[in-house]
């Protein structure tokens, strides 16, 4: 089960999995991967990259990319970079 259940002003529910990493890899349990594979729509993963070499501290990925994200880590292209862009993206869901 994801960490957050959100609801925006457009009447759309969405879920968010939160991850923190000091490197480029993200760790997912088999249950987390299965959830995102089973529910690929309106599910998202937000990763916070820590450390002095973190270029884009907050990155958001679609849940449908969880298998690739587990394999490639933060090398995978994010759908949003930065908290402002993430907020705006989630706010616009269903518009």
Please give the residue ranges for each predicted region.
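Conserved catalytic cores of phosphodiester-cleaving nucleases, focusing on short active-site segments
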Residues: 4-6, 11-22
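Intrinsically disordered, low-complexity regions of eukaryotic proteins
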Residues: 5, 19, 50, 70, ...
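Short, surface-exposed loop and linker segments with low hydrophobicity and enrichment for Pro/Ser/Thr
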Residues: 36-41, 79, 83
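Basic, glycine-rich
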Residues: 51-53, 67, 82, 86
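Charged phosphate-binding loop/patch that engages nucleotide di/tri-phosphates or the phosphate backbone
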Residues: 71-95
């Amino acid at each position: 089960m994801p960490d957050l259940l959100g609801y925006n002003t457009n009447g759309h529910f969405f879920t968010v999995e939160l991850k923190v990493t000091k490197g480029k890899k993200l760790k997912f349990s088999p249950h987390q991967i299965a959830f995102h594979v089973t529910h690929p729509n309106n599910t998202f993963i937000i990763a916070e990259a820590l450390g002095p070499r973190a270029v884009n501290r907050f990155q958001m990925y679609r849940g449908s990319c969880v298998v690739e994200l587990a394999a490639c880590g933060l090398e995978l292209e994010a759908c949003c970079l930065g908290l402002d862009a993430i907020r705006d993206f989630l706010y616009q869901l269903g518009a």
